[in-house]
Design a protein with these regions (language model features):
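N-terminal membrane topogenic signal
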Residues: 9-23
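Juxtamembrane segments of multi-pass membrane glycosylation machinery
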Residues: 55-61, 69-92, 97, 111-115, ...
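Transmembrane-helix motifs of polytopic, lipid-linked glycan transferases
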Residues: 88-116, 156-160, 329-334
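Extracytoplasmic catalytic/substrate-binding loops of multi-pass membrane glycan-assembly enzymes
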Residues: 36-48, 58-70, 264-265, 461-465
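Membrane-interface interhelical loops and short amphipathic "cap" helices
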Residues: 41-51, 75-84, 134-143, 366-384, ...
Length: 749
């Protein structure tokens, strides 16, 4: 019996079970709170936590609606700290999404099931499966970015569209469409995924009530609603002109303070549109495929396999593959059941699934995934990290079809144990007896598998290691020092530590990948140096006076900064003479295309050394790899904790300073003091149960390397007992993160 037939009989109760959906969403929220991160995490988490707390601008296009929403949650007294409050926002969004999938699954099941408890059971299956899919769960317990807010927007729009499909001629139909348009525009102000549901809405309207598009007033109202929803973007040029510490893209033409003239200027418009269109990323056209489309589908399949059993260590590959096929086939069966039983809502939900799977895969046009096809190694272009979060919407929405498919199989098996004829409206249908449903219910254990299979990998409970790493790296730098970093994971956590928790704001953090932009270098000149709190500083730097600098560490005007070229050619070594009279020999670097020279970022690093060194301490994060060595500073670097300090004259060996073949000059005294009295991460890393995210494994590895090298240095100066203590801590870190192989490799060097 189709939904149309059922709907024609007035005895069928189609009222949504909002109470049951609310209970399901609440239970999902409880699960997420139980596994919630107490702090920040790797990648973009710290950037967005800090941007929300400071009402700043994260990377383009700036996600203004999320920033406003995140700021609101950051001041709500619902958790002990800012990070947890914004993480709760992510958990709440995903829990509400689960409630929406519950309602949609229940609505489809209402087309052929007479008893409400049966429909509620189907809705519960959708909520459970969707909320425990690995990527959904992992994104819901720590606010890595904006994806859970986008998810709840898409889920709400989906439910509203299903309601519209039920009564497209009703008195609320037009208002529903305008509300859908507004929420889509508001969703776009959070992330471009806000428009993901619109193609499916369009298809549903074309099929069910095509004359809607002939009503120009309604169409115009819908377009205006979308534009109105996007108005949070208007806040960007205004907020940017107040120059918050996180001001990526700097969407203002103002230089020193906000004013009407510079706010409403061509320069502001150009910078705003450059930011809005994400021009700086230079992504190739969709028609210019980075890899074959089949390989991109393979990337999605890799991440789809993760959803039902996140086998980070590859120890359950066969079980993961079997589960993936089961959940894929159940979803396809559910789609077929949806088509057969409720054609109207299918005309929305079917195109939605197509949009968030095949169409999204084609549009995103990714390279090979970081973890995809490892046998190909570096012979193929790869993303710098796994992009499973971009398919969060597909894995979450897929749960509705999986629930429908699983329920259909459950019903078929239950009918084998006996059924009864039941009146449903004007029709009579065969429905399994209650005892038959119970007899077949063990099948539903399939829906519980992701809950238990993903708990360890998805849970962030008690994880503070990212925050602790940021604390430790900042504390490795002397007061008022400049710390040079290279990318997301050694930069964004520092922003969080400084802007949210107030840890070592005196340190000037310079990210080389951002130094290639004009707005970042203007902020380097503009931002004042903040004071050092001696009482909160590490013991390694106690007993000395540290005068606060009165000017930026670089002697350039805004105009001079903007005029620095993207790169300069340099065929041979060249001397760099500092303002204090010291001379360094700078080496050209091999850049893309075999070009030898220096990038804009390299030039700014040299300008800082030229203008501020040695009165301003200069450090390179040890996550920078060989970057400072490539520049020619290798003999002038001393390892100090998690950083390498630039010195004016190569040191000499002593009881606290040794030269190690694998590390270079090593400051035993300062590093030992930091390791034993200041660092927080060794304890939190030792508590881990593995390190799931392989692309960021360099962060725990820097502790393994530091501990191993420190122990080696201590042995070299006759401090064997201290070396054993350090090595014991290092071994606990390696065991907790599952990186004992890296420790063994380090010890063999």
């Amino acid at each position: 019996m189709t939904a149309t037939t059922a709907a024609s009989s007035g005895d069928v109760d189609y009222r949504p079970s909002y109470g049951a959906a609310a209970i399901a969403a609440t239970l999902v929220l409880v699960l997420y709170i139980a596994t919630l991160a107490p702090s920040t995490a790797m990648w973009d988490t710290s950037e967005y936590l800090a941007a929300a707390f400071t009402l700043g601008l994260p990377h383009p296009p700036g996600n203004p609606f999320f920033v406003l929403l995140g700021r609101f949650f950051s001041i709500l007294p619902i958790a002990p700290n800012v990070a947890m409050r914004i993480n709760i926002l992510a958990a709440l969004c995903s829990a509400v999404s689960a409630g929406m999938w519950f309602l949609i699954a229940e609505r489809v099941l209402a087309g052929w099931l007479p008893r409400r408890w049966q429909r509620i059971a189907g809705g519960a299956l959708a909520a459970l499966i969707g909320s425990t899919a690995f990527t959904v769960w992992a994104q819901s317990v720590v606010n890595e970015k904006v994806y859970t807010v986008s998810l709840v927007g898409m889920a709400i729009v989906s439910w509203l569209t299903v309601r519209w499909c039920d009564d497209p001629e009703g008195p609320k139909a037009d208002r529903l469409l305008i509300l859908i348009a507004y929420l889509s525009g508001l969703g776009y102000a959070n992330h471009m995924a806000g428009f993901l549901a619109l193609p499916a809405v369009f298809v549903a309207v074309v099929v069910i009530r095509p004359r809607t598009f002939l009503r120009w007033k309604l169409v115009l109202a819908g377009l205006l609603a979308i534009v109105l929803g996007m108005t949070p973007f208007l806040a960007q040029p205004i907020r940017s002109a107040y120059f918050p510490r996180i001001n990526e893209g700097e969407t203002t033409g103002c230089v020193t303070k906000i004013a009407v003239g510079c706010t409403f200027s061509d320069l502001t418009y150009q910078r705003f549109m450059y930011n809005f269109n994400r021009t700086q990323y230079g992504k190739p056209a969709v028609t210019d495929r980075q890899i074959p489309f089949t390989a991109q589908i393979g990337m999605w399949w890799t991440y789809f396999r993760w959803q039902w059993l996140r086998d980070a260590n590859g120890t359950h590959a066969a079980a993961q593959e079997v589960l993936a096929w089961i959940f894929l086939l159940l979803g396809l069966l559910g789609g077929w059941v949806h088509w057969q039983r409720d054609r109207r809502s299918f005309w929305f939900f079917g195109p939605l699934i197509f949009t968030v799977t095949l169409l999204l895969i084609y549009y995103m046009n990714f390279k090979y995934g970081y973890s995809q096809s490892p046998e190909l190694g570096d012979a193929v272009p790869r993303e710098v990290r796994d992009r499973d979060y971009f398919y969060l919407w597909s894995f979450s929405a897929w749960s509705v079809w999986v629930a429908l498919g699983l329920f259909n199989v459950w019903e078929r098996i239950a009918q084998m144990f006996g059924s009864d004829s039941v009146r449903m409206g004007a029709d009579t249908v065969e429905v399994p007896r209650q005892s038959s449903w119970m007899a077949a219910s063990p099948l539903l254990l399939l829906a519980v598998i992701p809950l238990f299979a993903n708990w360890t990998a998805a849970s962030r409970h008690g994880q503070t290691d990212t925050r602790d790493f940021a604390h430790d790296l900042l504390e490795s730098v002397e007061p008022y020092g400049v710390l040079i970093t290279v990318g997301d994971n050694d930069t964004f956590p520092l922003w969080y530590a400084q802007e949210v928790e107030g840890i070592r704001p005196d340190v000037t953090v310079l990210c080389t990948s951002l130094l290639n932009t004009d707005w970042y270098t203007r902020q380097l000149i503009r931002n004042p140096i903040r004071p050092y709190d001696l009482a909160d500083g590490p013991l390694a730097y106690a007993g000395s006076t540290w005068p606060q600098p009165t000017k930026a560490p670089i002697n350039l005007t805004y105009t001079q900064s903007d005029s620095v070229p993207p790169a300069v050619a340099l065929d041979a070594n060249q001397d760099l003479k500092t303002a204090s009279g010291y001379t360094f020999t700078v080496h050209p670097r091999e850049l893309d295309g075999g070009f030898h020279g220096l990038e804009r970022a390299d030039l700014f690093v040299l300008y800082i050394i030229r203008d501020a060194f040695p009165s301003t301490p200069v450090y390179f994060s040890r996550t920078d790899g060989s970057y400072p060595d490539e520049m020619g500073f290798g003999n002038y670097l001393v390892t100090t904790g998690l950083a390498r300090k630039l010195v004016a004259v190569p040191p000499t060996a002593s009881a606290t300073m040794v030269h190690l073949p694998s590390e270079g000059w090593f400051d035993i005294g300062t590093t030992y003091s930091l390791w034993t009295k200041t660092f927080d991460a060794p304890k939190s890393l030792a508590r881990r149960d593995g390190w799931v995210d392989r692309p960021s494994v360099g962060i725990p590895y820097v502790y393994i390397r530091t501990g191993a090298v420190l122990a080696e240095a201590l042995v070299q100066v006759g401090r064997a007992a201290d070396a054993q203590k350090v090595m014991a801590t290092t071994e606990r870190v390696a065991k907790g993160t599952g990186l004992t192989d890296l420790l063994a490799a380090q010890q063999q060097q």
